[in-house]
């Protein structure tokens, strides 16, 4: 199967507070850890399933050490996105365009 991703993923585990919203109503808040992240999205392992169309607000906790790819911290603290895939391993979230981090483009 041909890889469809335009941008590489980095296997970086970041703490994320995930607020799930459906039809404008908050349905759940979870504290989770990413499995990987790219310029356009992230995969988050979870046993919780979400309905199609679920939107997310994400607050990432960034490590204090020198991760150069996260120098654009301001935009990362209040990121929004949408569910693009959900399976028994977790959820894939695509970031809204205003949440994309230039530092991750080069991975």
Regions found by a protein language model. Give the residues of each.
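Generic short beta-strand segments
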Residues: 17-19, 59-65
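A structural micro-motif recognizing beta-strand termini
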Residues: 44-49, 96-98
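A generic structural micro-feature
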Residues: 6-10, 26, 72-75, 83-85
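Short, Lys/Arg- and Gly-enriched loop/turn segments at beta-strand edges
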Residues: 63-74
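C-terminal output/interaction extensions
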Residues: 23, 79-82, 88-107
């Amino acid at each position: 199967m041909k890889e469809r991703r335009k941008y590489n993923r980095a296997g970086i585990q970041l703490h994320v507070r995930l607020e799930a919203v459906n039809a404008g109503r908050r349905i759940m808040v979870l504290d989770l850890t990413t499995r990987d992240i790219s310029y356009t999205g992230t995969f988050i392992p979870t046993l919780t399933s979400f309905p199609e169309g679920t939107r997310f607000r994400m607050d990432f906790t960034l490590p204090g050490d020198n991760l150069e790819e996260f120098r654009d911290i301001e935009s990362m603290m209040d990121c929004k996105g949408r569910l693009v895939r959900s399976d028994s391993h977790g959820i894939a979230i695509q970031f809204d365009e205003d949440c994309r981090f230039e530092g991750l483009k080069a991975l």
